[in-house]
Amino acid sequence: MCPVIMGTDKHHELGVGVSAIWSPMCDRFGIDSPIFGFAHDIETVAAITNAGGFGVYGATRRFPEEITQELAQIRSLVGNRPFGVDLVLPPGMPEHNSREAIQAEIPQEHTEFVQQLVERFEVPKASKPGMRTRFIRSKEIEQAQLRAVMESDVDMLACGIGAPADVVAQAKDRGKTTLALIGSPHHVPKAVAAGVEIIVAQGYDAGAHTGPIGTYSLVPQIVDAAGDIPVLAAGGVATGRHIAAALAMGAQGVWLGTAWLLSKEHQGDMHRVNRDKLIQAGSADTVITRSESGKPFRQVRTGWSQAWEAEGAPAPLKMPYQDVLVGDLLGAIEEHDIEPLIHSGAGQSIAYFNDVKPVAQIMQALIDETAQALHTQQQFLRL
């Protein structure tokens, strides 16, 4: 079980003399709180780190030269404080970055369905490639992205949908901590064999790519299976009560993504329609669909997910074919403000976030609430 130490602060408003939470993750990385935050924009990542957590930059959709530049930008914003980068490294991707080769294998039924959506919602053509078709997810681009990461001074490499042993070894040789996000206890032996140093147990509640097992059921199983490898809990973590529960289940910290979607720092990358939909969304307003990328992906339910769930819709293709099929359309939807189809990845914890706040304020609330929850739990002990 991960020890948690609570500090004191005369200005604390809880009335319990507590203002800090601690786990071995804090000493390992020199952070103030064991809260790891994932985001797709550099301002939010830097703000998480500067607020005493550990920011992680989602760079899967970035060109290698962009990764180099953006990691340097984050470093300039955080100084010597630690931060990480996340890449999705799924097995079975094509060798080369060839759009034509992928398009040639897409069934006509799927192409016609996408065209029907274009006509039904009167979507003009995109003026530039969409986020999912700027390049084709392939081993070629993956290797170039990894070179950019390895040549940077980023402190951690987080691997999603696979953590290849050779990549883990290379990162460790470069002095970078390695982390794998997994959604099933069955994935633990492979992660351990690959040599990862931290495991994120990501439950079904989580936004974006996620697995089939609920966080409450998943975390203790992965903690038990991981042995001495520390585990972070992810999926549905939105308040200090969730963090306290994660620590009680044996996690040494938490990994949050949805919590930052409505942060002030993130709004530069947030479409106004997405922001409004996220503010209004409850836990039941999210849905898991393969229509986004070909992998299970939790997002806010909109006309997009409903169209792919409708009778007569084709089954989404596997990654990266679904990316190529829908990528340009998804880009056009946001570019031209097609409101019924605009959507965002988000976890079930979105119900807890209904206005825009600075990252530092979100972080402090999480710390205060965790301390309060841990203090309150002591009443259930009879010594």
Can you name each region flagged by the protein language model?
Residues Q103-F113, P212, S217-L232, A238-L383:
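Conserved active-site-proximal phosphate/metal-binding subdomains
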Residues C2, G7-A225:
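Active-site entrance/lid segments in N-terminal catalytic domains of soluble metabolic enzymes
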